[in-house]
UniProtKB/Swiss-Prot annotation:
Protein name (Swiss-Prot/TrEMBL): Holliday junction branch migration complex subunit RuvA
Gene name as annotated: ruvA
Region (Domain I): 1-64
SMART domains assigned: HhH1
Keywords: Cytoplasm, DNA damage, DNA recombination, DNA repair, DNA-binding
Native source organism of the sequence: Yersinia pestis
Function: The RuvA-RuvB-RuvC complex processes Holliday junction (HJ) DNA during genetic recombination and DNA repair, while the RuvA-RuvB complex plays an important role in the rescue of blocked DNA replication forks via replication fork reversal (RFR). RuvA specifically binds to HJ cruciform DNA, conferring on it an open structure. The RuvB hexamer acts as an ATP-dependent pump, pulling dsDNA into and through the RuvAB complex. HJ branch migration allows RuvC to scan DNA until it finds its consensus sequence, where it cleaves and resolves the cruciform DNA.
């Protein structure tokens, strides 16, 4: 199983990154909370991975540290939560925020995440609460604001907004809802990652 990759970032298309390691390009899907922290194109990155095999695909999910990966592994053990939904959950809020919502049994906040209904939110609270005790506390430290790159002047605001909406759809939002969220927070000159982050915050 592939558990860790170290290589050069060739492409970034939220939530997907293409990482070249020893001449091989690996496509890795990351939660947006991890995607924001990636280095720029052409720079080296270290990604901790979870390899998932389905009938129709073999997928790699990536994380910035072992603790985030551990939380992802626990999430996909919950009945009704697959890798795609786990990715959406960890994109919609940080690990620290998710843990806080579960410990407070905050169903109202959890159901605002894409793909999470009331029953799923209740299962998350019941099944995840006791599992946090076995995870490293470093996972829940607040790392502060993340500095994001500015948008390229060659890319139009409309193209950036379309890319952000496409990323939200990949995370589980319906196309109309994704477009509505992006339109709500769009501002001239904003880059794609900022729009995605602001849209996810607005959804909560």
């Amino acid at each position: 199983m592939i558990g860790r990759l170290r290589g050069i970032i060739l492409e970034k298309q939220p939530p997907l990154v293409l990482l070249e390691t020893n001449g091989v390009g690996y496509e890795v899907q990351l939660p947006m909370t991890c995607f924001y922290e990636l280095p720029e194109l052409g720079q080296e990155a270290i990604i901790f991975t979870q390899f998932v095999v389905r009938e129709d695909a073999q997928l790699l999910y990536g994380f910035n540290n072992k603790q985030e990966r551990a939380l992802f592994r626990e999430l996909i053990k919950v009945n009704g939560v697959g890798p795609k939904l786990a990715l959406a959950i960890l994109s919609g809020m940080s690990a620290q925020q998710f843990v806080g919502a579960v410990e407070r049994e905050d169903i109202t906040t959890l159901v605002k995440l894409p793909g999470v209904g009331k029953k799923t939110a209740e299962r998350l609270v019941v099944e995840m609460k006791d599992r946090f005790k076995g995870l490293n506390g470093d996972l829940f430290n607040n790392t502060g604001d993340i500095s994001l790159p500015t948008a390229s002047p060659q890319t139009s605001d409309a193209d950036i907004e379309a890319e952000a909406a496409s990323a939200l759809v990949a995370l589980g939002y319906k196309p109309q809802e994704a477009s509505r969220l992006v339109s709500k927070i769009a501002k001239p000159g904003a880059d794609c990652e900022t729009l995605i982050r602001d849209a996810l915050r607005a959804a909560l």
